[in-house]
Amino acid sequence: MKPKVLKIIPKSKNLLPVSIGGNNPLFTIAEIGLNHNGDIELGKKLIDAAHEAGCISVKFQNFETEDVYIEGKKAGKYELLGENIEIYKLHKNLEIEFNFLSELKQYAENKGLYFFSAPMGNNALKMLMDLDCDLVKIASYEISNLPWIRKVAETNKPIIMSCGGARLEEVDRALNEIYKYHSNVALMHCVIKYPALLHEANLQIINTLKTAFEIPVGFSNNGFRHKSGEIDYETAPHAAAALGMEVYEIHITLDREMDGVDQGFSTEPNELKEMISHVNATRSKFLDSQNIEVDEICIGSGIKKTLECEKYVRAFAYKSIFSIKNIKKGDKLSMNNIKCLRSGE
């Protein structure tokens, strides 16, 4: 059976059409995410770093905080890299406007980079549609939120969907919702622990997902470290490429010492350039059926389940149903009186 591919047809004349999967080159994503810190010039410098490293695309996150967490301090604090962060306030400070994204999209496309985002909420998705982005990302935390998945699929844009923390049956349900509209989709294996230990990478899941769903599968790298605490930027991406990943996503920063929630586990420009060169070379060897040595520590069992190290983030950030109005006995539940939000603390 001929492998399915995800096809992206760009609107910008500065971009070439892309096919992901099969015998095609690796599709590389520089995840800028929230690391722009609300500063458009910092965002441009990160796009420059992605371009200089040889990435094919840059990805952001956009949202209105009310569509992500319950309002104010009720959302609680999130533990990351030894700090307890007031999560609602953090997101509120990182909301970005249409003009901010529009300028960065134009800047990226002028450099020949695809630009897209992981939207959170209807207004965020509308912003991307108004920008006419060429593809959309569905974050791991949305994979059980079937109404949202339908909403994204209705746009008929190509979708890259992460499935960190999910069980195989949850991935199956989410894909079936997308298939009601189209099949132009790729999956991303990731571990929702920031950063995780190398032995928690379980990269064999890449092949588990390929076998189960027969669509392109990639690896979203949220950072890995040794038990000593030392960050490792080489072992996991090399092994993922050797196992046949078709998309590679990595968080980037100009400096891990910068302020910002995700800076501390992100990849700096010099590391990024070396990493992208390395994974592309490994991808070429894989396509040529060459023997590739990998460190067995990050291969894992290949069983797709919620890992022990993912349970905290899954409980905090996967979507739950909240009432947004007083609901009386006998009232019908609808999006007028309930909302899907991250659970929080």
Explain the meaning of each model-derived region.
Residues 1-345:
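Catalytic cores and adjacent flexible loops of soluble metabolic enzymes
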